[in-house]
Amino acid sequence: MKKSYRVKSEKDFNAIFNDKQSVANKRFVIYKLDKDQKHFRVGLSVSKKLGNAVVRNGIKRKIRHVLIEHRQELQAVDFVIIARKGVEELDYKETERNLLHVLKLAKIYQEGIPSEKEE
């Protein structure tokens, strides 16, 4: 995933959290901030409680893969995905199903509707 698709700075994370638009399901929490931009930006948070670095990086890799696969259908907003306990036990298909479910609840993902603006 290109750097332009990532939320990295503490300032950006705080702006998203302070906007207080959040949605959750059993496996993920999403905070979002509506912004006028060409494409989405995402920040990932996986707690040390979920496992060692290998496990946490595997979770982040699965999440990024889902986002890359469905990037054309994601709205141009900033959002942070927080992984909850139990996500480390999911295989890729279950992770994808759970993540797309919470993205739909947050109105970030719309199936079959390309939303990325022309660059």
Swiss-Prot record:
A GO cellular component annotation in the UniProt record: ribonuclease P complex
Record SUPFAM superfamilies: Ribosomal protein S5 domain 2-like (SSF54211)
Top-level EC class as recorded in UniProt: hydrolase
Alphabetically ordered keywords of this record: Endonuclease, Hydrolase, Nuclease, RNA-binding, tRNA processing
Hydrolase recorded as keyword: yes
Molecular functions (GO terms): 3'-tRNA processing endoribonuclease activity; ribonuclease P activity; tRNA binding
Subunit and partners: Consists of a catalytic RNA component (M1 or rnpB) and a protein subunit.
Role played: RNaseP catalyzes the removal of the 5'-leader sequence from pre-tRNA to produce the mature 5'-terminus. It can also cleave other RNA substrates such as 4.5S RNA. The protein component plays an auxiliary but essential role in vivo by binding to the 5'-leader sequence and broadening the substrate specificity of the ribozyme.
Name assigned to this protein: Ribonuclease P protein component
Species: Streptococcus gordonii (strain Challis / ATCC 35105 / BCRC 15272 / CH1 / DL1 / V288)
Upper taxonomic lineage: Bacteria, Bacillati, Bacillota, Bacilli, Lactobacillales
Protein's gene: rnpA
